[in-house]
Amino acid sequence: MDEALAFRDMISRILTLPPGDDAIVAVKIDICKKYRLHAVPKNSAILAAALPEEKKILRKILLVKPTRTLSGVAPVAVMTSPAPCPHGKCLPCPGGPEHPYQSPQSYTGEEPAALRAREHNYDPFAQVHARLEQFETLGHRVDKVELIVMGGTMTARPAEYQEQFVARCIESMNTYPGGTPAPVPPDVVSVEDANELSAIRCVAITFETRPDWCKREHIDRMLGLGVTKVELGVQHVDDAILTYNRRGCTVADTVEANTLLRDAGLKVGFHMMPNLPCSTLESDKQMFETIFTDPRFMPDFLKIYPTLVTPGSEIEEHWERGIYSPYKEDELIELIAYAKTLIPEFIRLQRIQRDIPAKLIVAGSRHSNFRQLAQNRLTATGRKCRCIRCREIGRLPSVVESDMRVMKYECCGGTEHFISAVSGDSLIGFTRLRFPSQVYRPELENAALMRELHVYGSLVPVGRDADSEEWQHRNYGRALLALAEETATAGGYSRLAIMSGMGVRPYYRRQGYERAGPYMVKELP
């Protein structure tokens, strides 16, 4: 068996196929039979065997689900072990350790990330390794990773668990593909420092938590773990609805958490749940109007999770007794479409609908393509969504010359500047610059806060220049940073503090920034 010859034959045949062609699998199987290979090779192995001039074309042909990394990073979602929420259980909660599913709180255990977690016994190292391997098998690059920690109220877990979980995740990136976890869990500082020069850079870390478990002490711990983004389970902005659903937190908790997170330089996302028990179509419309216009809210990104009735949940009992009824399908589509028309240009609608399998949905929408249904409704009625995701350059190509725009708005007692690079109506990249409402971290004295810098388009590996069709690594980030510095100086600030992912710190050092706690800081002229 000549494996090298088999790969050459396979590559030459695949290069004749169009991108995403189903015939790729048939070619692989045929070559395996011809050369008596013991296993069908992964896409990553095929790419490794290709000549340099073949790799770019080959990657486009082999790439499966290209939207996964279209925003410029590979999202790696991991799940913490099952543990109860500190307040108890909400009315619509679909799972938890005491549920028959014995799943992480607020998950059924059948979601893709939950299945991966359970398969690996909730081991963080193994989960990250498996997801990276899966991405590579699908033909994606994994040079830049956003780690998303899911599974309930992470900030309520013991500090040691939080630290070891994150450290193992980063260790997995640092040692991929052939590494194994160290016998003794590494400390967070050492693995994060090592990641700055790793082949796989962690450019962002997201934690899910509750608004009432996002006080200063929780935020300080998250910053120490390298967290750059926090998703809050807001669900609604009506205290009566929250109380009825036994959320255990209030609108005031959300406002406080939103303010503290922003003034610490972190990015903030909201999870919202229309169609909760006790809510109505009108109150849900009001909810969306409020979060997009009221300066106490206005999240950086948003996930909309229409309420679902799942087996064994308390909401199922309400549904069976006729106390609760989901909205009609058409009503829900129109509600989400209406919400999309309200979204400002500085907010990203990240997701609509949960990953719960249709077989576990007793009542509620079973559509997995809810975003498409809402978008179709907008198109049919001549309306548009102006959110970040709908305008990303990778989804909305443009050949118009680019320019810079600055949008200023008040939020949580401070002033936000959404500085963007655009080409026509396509968004190339942006930065979020905040003049804070208060300073409670010593590193941030007299500093404006750059909470995010992001350039869109397909992921370009660290250290490689962009091709003509790619947008990363073409100095847009540097131009956005320069404009943020100018804006901060004009605002009377003598320093700029950047909320940087550990894998991006070397880039900011090259721009004159130095490490100060969890931030990269520069003295402004």
Describe each model-derived feature in a short phrase.
Residues 222, 508, 513:
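Conserved active-site tyrosine of GNAT-family acetyltransferases
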